[in-house]
Amino acid sequence: MADATEALVLLARLRAGEADAARAAIEAHWPAGGSPFAAAGGTHLARLQIMTPPARPRHRAPGEHLLLAADVDAPLDAWIERLRRAAAGPLDAVLGHCAFYPGAAEPAAFVRWVAANRLSVGFSVIGSPGATLAEVGAALDLRAEIGAFAEAGQRMTPSELHTAWRAWRRA
């Protein structure tokens, strides 16, 4: 059975001196309460941040990079296109600080840039790689319903519990 999820790890070099502007753009366009990643649909989890490599003795200061990591419903290419369409403004505001970023307006150039900056993924932290985001959500809803039923059942007689169970199963 094929996994229902795929992962993307993108590491793009920032243009010299633009790390602070990129951080400000992330803060402005990726607010804690409403990430543009959600607008793409099928996003299990995603992260966007500036990475500063450690300094090495006798070497010039390393360049900073932008990390975009996401675990999403498969197929990944469809998610990337949905993200490009749904979050073009925020993507351009943040990724525009990266070297050679072409912008989200031109789909083919955007896809080529993502591919050029993509890293292979060795693992995923998704607990249910065989389930889509909708399936995970439905399972969590069912778990909550069963929990509520079990709690309510503590106060029922055996006859009431049987009747409630039959009614719940039909719903």
Stretches with model-predicted labels:
Residues 1-55, 62-65, 70-78, 106-171:
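Short S/T/G/P-rich N-terminal loop/turn motif that feeds into the first structured element of a domain
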Residues 60, 84-86:
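Low-complexity, intrinsically disordered
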Residues 89-103:
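Conserved short beta-strand edge segments in small beta-sheet-based binding/regulatory domains
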